[in-house]
Amino acid sequence: MDQFAVFGNPVAHSKSPRIHQLFARQTGIEHRYGKILVPISKFQEALDTFLKQGGIGVNITVPFKEQAFIRANELTERARLSGAVNTLKLLNNNQLLGDNTDGIGLLTDLMRLEFITQGQHILIIGAGGAARGVLFPLLEFGCKITITNRTFSRAIQVANNFSAIGSIRPAEMKVLNSPEFDLIINATASGINGEIPTISPFIFNENCVCYDMFYQANLTPFISFARKHGVSRYADGLGMLVGQAAHSFKLWHGVLPEISPVLLTLEQELRS
């Protein structure tokens, strides 16, 4: 049986194996899917070992998306633009194709939630692989984007990298202190450690919506912080996770599974 896995650090919390189990059951396409904790400095070695053992497809989560981008022999257009890869597929010629399904996963979920409209002003918090993976579809959708990051130079670099696609305003965290945004997206990994980004509470208001690309059974730290400061419409990244996984599954198998029933099952399991 073909082997697939998610690579990350940490990875114990990952719902990806459960999602792909549900996709396999739904489509009748069986595949073995596991999760692999990869030492921070051993991504290349872990990937080579997995491929030698019969692996043909990998999902990549933090902090390895940029390394997967470098490792891929071929890239889809959305992966090339983002500079980050969350899905690898071993081709028949033994070359690795790198894709990024994060953006389509996020956009699909934002549309499902009715969180996004054309012309909206969006603040993206974070400038790593997760943030870069979602910028292309948001720009294509017609959104106005501001990006901020703890290391401001990275926000500037990301804005410059996407200048051919659309205008992104880089802003220092310390100067963001007014409620000018329609949608605020946390694309940092701060929630994994129970932390929040170092942002001003004054960016929130009762009219903006918040989305955390991190997910957990309870409210994420970022969403709890936003709620405390007046936000009443919010969501975590579980829907995005299922959406990006569906498009990874399509890359590997040529079939796009239904997202809604899998998302419903996961929500029920998390609540219980």
UniProtKB/Swiss-Prot annotation:
The keyword Oxidoreductase applies. GO terms for molecular function: NADP binding; shikimate 3-dehydrogenase (NADP+) activity. InterPro entries: Aminoacid_DH-like_N_sf, NAD(P)-bd_dom_sf, SDH_C, Shikimate_DH, Shikimate_DH-bd_N, Shikimate_DH_fam, Shikm_DH/Glu-tRNA_Rdtase. Homodimer. Its EC number is 1.1.1.25. Shikimate binds at S14, K15, S16, T61, N86, D102, Y215. Keywords: Amino-acid biosynthesis, Aromatic amino acid biosynthesis, NADP, Oxidoreductase. The active site is at K65. Involved in the biosynthesis of the chorismate, which leads to the biosynthesis of aromatic amino acids. Catalyzes the reversible NADPH linked reduction of 3-dehydroshikimate (DHSA) to yield shikimate (SA). One of its GO terms (biological process) is aromatic amino acid family biosynthetic process. The keyword NADP applies. NADP(+) binds at E77, G126, A127, G128, G129, A130, N149, R150, T151, F152, S153, R154, M213, G237. It catalyses: shikimate + NADP(+) = 3-dehydroshikimate + NADPH + H(+). This is Shikimate dehydrogenase (NADP(+)). Belongs to the shikimate dehydrogenase family. One of its GO terms (cellular component) is cytosol. Pathway: Metabolic intermediate biosynthesis; chorismate biosynthesis; chorismate from D-erythrose 4-phosphate and phosphoenolpyruvate: step 4/7. It comes from Photorhabdus laumondii subsp. laumondii (strain DSM 15139 / CIP 105565 / TT01). Coiled coil: none annotated.
